[in-house]
Amino acid sequence: MDGDSPDIEEVFNLAEKFGAGVMVDEAHGTGLTGENNLGQAQQFINHPNCVAIIYPLGKSAGLSGAFVVGSKMLKQYLINFSRSFIYTTGPSKQLVIQLR
């Protein structure tokens, strides 16, 4: 890894051109890039081709776990079909406090 990042605007332009969805993993951008340090993709959260933005907490946040930002439909899908969500425990109180 050498710190490269894609032209995220071009990625979304291509997705729009070809009718594709975009999922962005912000493992290394959160806290460092983008408006309010929320990563590069934050500005595209309402873009029609944005399927999900994934924020892993084990890298730049120094915590554990992750969260996903997406549509209500994606939320319902993950609640009902994501095995790693269904068969796990909730985050600890300390983890939630650290995340805030």
Task: Indicate where each model-derived feature is located.
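Active-site C-terminal subdomain of aminotransferase-like
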Residues: 18-24, 28, 33-100
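Active-site core of PLP-dependent enzymes with the aminotransferase class I/II
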Residues: 1-18
